[in-house]
Amino acid sequence: AAHGGPPFEPHATVVGAVAAAAAADVAPYTATTPYMPHVSLLYGDLTDEEK
């Protein structure tokens, strides 16, 4: 309405679409295992038995 367009009530459809798109963008980067804080003193590829 401020720029000559028709007035309309805000609605959740736009918000839902934006939230769904954001969740889809982040999905490939979510961790597959729980985060475990650690200090790396040894660098290399270790087997589970070596760890």
From Swiss-Prot:
Record-linked Gene3D superfamilies: Cyclic phosphodiesterase
Enzyme class name: hydrolase
SUPFAM superfamilies membership: LigT-like
GO molecular function: cyclic-nucleotide phosphodiesterase activity
Active site (UniProt): H11 (proton donor/acceptor), H38 (proton donor/acceptor)
Enzyme Commission no: 3.1.4.-
Keywords (A to Z) from UniProt: Hydrolase
Annotated InterPro entries: Cyclic-nucl_3Pdiesterase, Cyclic_Pdiesterase
Binding-site list for substrate: T13, S40, Y43
Keyword Hydrolase attached: yes
Listed PANTHER family: 2',3'-CYCLIC-NUCLEOTIDE 3'-PHOSPHODIESTERASE
Function: Hydrolyzes ADP-ribose 1'',2''-cyclic phosphate (Appr>1) that is produced during tRNA splicing into ADP-ribose 1''-phosphate (Appr-1''p).
Family: Belongs to the 2H phosphoesterase superfamily. CPD1 family.
Protein name according to UniProt: Cyclic phosphodiesterase
